[in-house]
């Protein structure tokens, strides 16, 4: 059951704009059949920002739309429709809005005026200097501990690139930064609308990402051709590459798809002025993960998670824990264990311990991610009893949840 389905049953209006990526072949999988009243966006996982078309085209509610005319940019359009859905609401019922930007997912496409804001800094400084500056700033802000080391670096140093390579890869990063910049602008636009219409103070806002930065197709200098950047016909590559993905994930190891911190550790920003006003600017370092979003929203709204749905079918019980006890400093732990699996990248966390089986590795690894957040020191040989326990717990979870490909449903 989706969050939208639960909240709709509890008297909420439910709106969505942006990237669905939860089933596109068969209308029964589309947002309006999964609890949303209104939807504008793409059903696929990626699209052209400038001219979404074909299987990666736009849908309004249950209607496929024609290719939009220029000028068009998905980030702006998704925000405009999100505001429109809320603005068209005529009653005083509460609303749930899910705004899922496709940015900064590939392809690299951004507004020229935004790109120009970033071309100079990335060309002049390069990824080594940018990476170090980000670590220093994160330390100053209290995001990471002062003694945090960099994870392994998988690429050449900036001064080892040719001048032509520097030109091209710096431009890729500038376009990526422009995509993020446009997200920032549009989040502010949405919040300004809510504030102007006196809805912001009593609105719980949660801003998060689904994974770490993306290195696909895992080439140091990026995928696709620089000449393809801002080509409206491109809906997949070009991308910004492995090196810049590692910079984006400073100081962590690896990137999207992998179960190291660079793949799974992302920030969550929470704002709820009427209920969390005394928490402004506070850090919460208690680990949580995506299954916690549903129970957090249930606690905030008073909605009830059903035992049956879709014609009386029994559904899986609620997974996850509300984040509010952690946010309110009432607990320092939400889970005994947390589990991950994506494309055969596996991980489990238990307290300070994290066990990982990487797609490229032959053995499970073990890290103390409180002392070693960047996963530099594999402690599997020093603590075999801990590793054995965690692998057994992961296998138990995987079997219970039919995790593929190692655990096919029987």
Which residue stretches match the model-derived regions?
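Formylglycine-dependent sulfatase
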Residues: 1-365, 369-410
């Amino acid at each position: 059951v989706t969050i939208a389905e639960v909240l709709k049953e509890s008297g909420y209006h439910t709106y969505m704009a942006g990237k669905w990526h939860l089933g596109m072949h068969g209308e029964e999988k589309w947002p309006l059949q999964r609890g949303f009243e209104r939807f504008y966006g793409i059903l696929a996982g990626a699209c052209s920002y400038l001219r979404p078309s074909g299987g990666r085209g736009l849908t309004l509610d249950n209607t496929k739309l024609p290719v939009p005319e220029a000028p068009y940019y998905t980030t702006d359009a998704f925000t405009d429709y999100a505001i429109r859905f809320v603005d068209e609401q005529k009653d005083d019922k509460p609303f749930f809005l899910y705004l899922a930007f496709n940015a900064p997912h590939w392809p690299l496409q951004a507004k020229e005026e935004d790109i120009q804001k970033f071309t100079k800094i990335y060309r002049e400084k390069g990824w080594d200097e940018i990476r170090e500056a980000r670590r220093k700033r994160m330390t100053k802000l209290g995001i990471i501990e002062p003694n945090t080391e960099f994870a392994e670096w998988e690429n050449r140093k900036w001064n080892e690139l040719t001048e032509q390579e520097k030109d091209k890869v710096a431009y890729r990063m500038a376009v990526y930064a422009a995509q993020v910049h446009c997200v920032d602008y549009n989040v502010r636009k949405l919040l300004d609308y809510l504030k102007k219409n006196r809805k912001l103070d009593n609105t719980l806002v949660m801003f998060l990402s689904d994974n770490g930065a993306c290195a696909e197709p895992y080439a140091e200098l990026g995928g696709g051709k620089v000449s393809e950047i801002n080509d409206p016909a491109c809906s997949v590559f070009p991308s910004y590459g492995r090196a810049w993905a590692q910079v984006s994930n400073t100081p962590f190891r690896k990137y999207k798809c992998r179960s190291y911190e660079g793949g799974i550790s992302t920030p969550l920003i929470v704002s709820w002025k009427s209920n969390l006003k005394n928490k402004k600017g506070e850090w919460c370092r208690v680990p949580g993960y995506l299954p916690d979003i549903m129970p957090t929203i249930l606690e905030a709204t008073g909605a009830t998670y059903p035992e049956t749905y879709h014609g009386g079918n029994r559904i899986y019980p609620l997974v996850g824990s509300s984040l509010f006890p952690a946010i309110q400093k009432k607990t320092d732990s939400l889970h005994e264990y947390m589990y991950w699996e994506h494309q055969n990248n596996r991980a489990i966390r238990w307290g300070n311990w994290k066990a990982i089986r990487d797609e490229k590795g032959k053995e499970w690894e073990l890290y103390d991610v409180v002392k070693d957040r960047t996963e530099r020191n594999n402690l599997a040989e020093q603590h075999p009893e801990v590793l054995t326990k965690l692998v057994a717990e992961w296998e138990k979870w995987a079997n219970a949840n039919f995790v593929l490909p190692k655990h096919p449903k029987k």
